[in-house]
Amino acid sequence: MGKTLFENIWDEHVIYEREDGDVLLYIDRHMTHDLHFRSFAAFKENGLTLREPDKTFGVPDHSVPTTAKTIDDIPEGEMRTAVEVLAEAAEEMGFTHYSMTDDRHGIVHVVGPEQGITLPGLTLVCGDSHTSTHGALGCISFGIGSTEVQHVMATQTVWQRKPKMMRINITGKLGFGVSGKDVILAVIREISAAGGTGYAIEFAGPVIEAMSMEGRMTVCNMAIEAGARSGIIAPDEKTIEYCKGRPYSPTGTEWDK
């Protein structure tokens, strides 16, 4: 029996499998944000070291008011502390940090694709349920908890159990003014807000193929609203064209591979 896209990527990243079915999974990319500031403090208190600084990327977005341009614009309090701690952790540990004054700054799940951090065939995690957004580029992506954030930082791995597989094939064509958001809401209406519980959903079919990359990201983002662990879309020429030339995308012979 053949494997799904998700299963192929998963199996390539399994380091060890326990008798209970849980596996130690290698993580290619770790996105983090300001609400992990307590994880950074605990990480430091436990005397741990960031294993692979070049594979962690920090983006302050959860506590940043839309009107704030710099940290000084955020009122004193926990929100400001969260942003400050992320910046301090990045400087101390040496991981990439897209600060509020960086032109590349934005929402963590948008920065990843825009910068080429998110690429087909990778595993990517972040301490946020909507990490599934990145699956639109053909990678395995899922949210993790605060303790798991520390585990990934220390080992570049995480313990997980492989989800069940579900494929949703969407036929027909998008009508005028109909977006990816409408499509995924229609899917959730059909399968319910718990219909994807325990599954990784692969979205496919002509409607998905016709969507922009941003539309695909919206669909995968909201797989969580169907209860799914993750969403994924097989990469195609549109995906490759989107990734081409971005800062962290391969170049030269590496791109040709």
Listing of model-derived features with the role each one plays in the protein:
Residues 1-257:
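Fe-S-dependent hydro-lyases/dehydratases of central metabolism
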